[in-house]
Amino acid sequence: MHELGITQNIVAIVAENANNRLIKRVTLEIGELSAIMPNAIEFCFDVCTQGTVLEGATLEIIKIPGLGKCRQCATEIPLEQPFGICHVCNSVELDIIQGQELKIKEMEVEELSV
């Protein structure tokens, strides 16, 4: 399960950028073609955040659908797997233009009290 290592890296990156403030929420974008299982990330998040500034934070995952572009006719095609056939010209030469990403889109931190 490579999601554990990925989640550990996410927690480390967010904690590093939190400047010792508590994190309330983390939003990730995970592409549906990325081979990353959002359910596993959610499970690992609870474990990996224990004892950190992220402990108790909410994890929000936005799934990004797969999208390919035909090299022959430039048609954009929705993809459920990292390959497919253009429904316009029947070419199998597709470039994946969306759906492989893993991004930390946003983090919400507790406000500093003065």
Curated annotation (Swiss-Prot):
Binding site for Zn(2+): 70, 73, 86, 89
InterPro entries: Hydgase_Ni_incorp_HypA/HybF_CS, HypA/HybF
UniProt keyword annotations, A-Z: Metal-binding, Nickel, Zinc
UniProt cross-references to Pfam families, sorted A to Z: HypA
An MF annotation (GO) of this entry: nickel cation binding
Biological processes annotated in GO: protein maturation; protein modification process
NCBIfam families: hypA
Family classification: Belongs to the HypA/HybF family.
Function noted in UniProt: Involved in the maturation of [NiFe] hydrogenases. Required for nickel insertion into the metal center of the hydrogenase.
Name of protein: Hydrogenase maturation factor HypA
Organism: Trichodesmium erythraeum (strain IMS101)
Organismal lineage: Bacteria, Bacillati, Cyanobacteriota, Cyanophyceae, Oscillatoriophycideae
